[in-house]
C-alpha cells in the first residue's frame, strides 16, 4: 500500500561541510541561508549541478533533498524483487516560478561510457517521469558529459547513451523554458 502526503520543504536542515575544501562560497540560491559550496556528502554531478544553478539566471532557488527520512520528498518504485522502495530525487528547483524535480547520476566519460552505478536508474526515471506528468511539473535525470564538458538532461525516455537524442544540454533546456515564461 502506497501512502501519499503533501510535501513541504523543511524549515531548517543541518549540513556537514568539508573544512579542507578550497571553495567555501555560500550558495545564494539554496533555500537555506548559509549553505556552502563545500557541503558534504555530494557527488561530482551534484556539485556541478549546484554550480550550474547558482550561475543560471533562470533558476530562482534550489533545494537539496535528503536521501532518507519521512521529512524528505520521495517517490515509490518497485525493485527487482517486487518490493516497494523509496526514491529520493536529489533536487527540487524553481525555474522562473516553474517547479522542476532533478535526479543527478554519475556522468559519462570522454568516450560516452556511462559512470552511473545505480541499476535502478531506468525504473527511477519512469516513476519520476510519471510523477512529473501527473502533477504538471518539469524535470528529469541530469548527468555530466566529459566529452562536451556540459551537464545533460534526459526528460522523455531513459537511455544509457549520452549521444542518443534522449539527452540534451541542460543549459539550453533551462534557458529555453526560462525564455518561454
Locate each region found by the language model:
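Electrostatic, structured charged patches in enzyme active sites and in nucleic-acid/phosphate-binding
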Residues: 1-181
